């Protein structure tokens, strides 16, 4: 076998691309090893100072088309007056050529929010898009207003992927 990557931080999500190691039409085997060393445990709180051991979360293997988005995240930033916001969206892509990303923002009521700009060309590598949102409904424990951000990836005018994220301002 071939070592692909190492990840430190057992409680953080991570992904890795195994495409270069897959042999189409042949038997492929993926092995995941967990090392939980007692001498590598933080004693920050003095509580629960013991090895955890094993895989505690789901492990998912998924296939993506060559033109795709990964490491997607969305952040909301409110202005100093706590009135208007900017929705900052980041992601990466291994390939770009002729692809674009389109966004739809749906209010908690189900009404589509009118975005000033909703389509962006997909660039190879890291991408960052900013969507200004005027006076969005705010999220708090008593008013859990969540918007739905729909992300659509298209290439040469044809939709090749779509997913949603729930967003609070």
Protein language model regions, located:
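Secreted/periplasmic carbohydrate-active enzymes, especially glycoside hydrolases
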Residues: 2-169
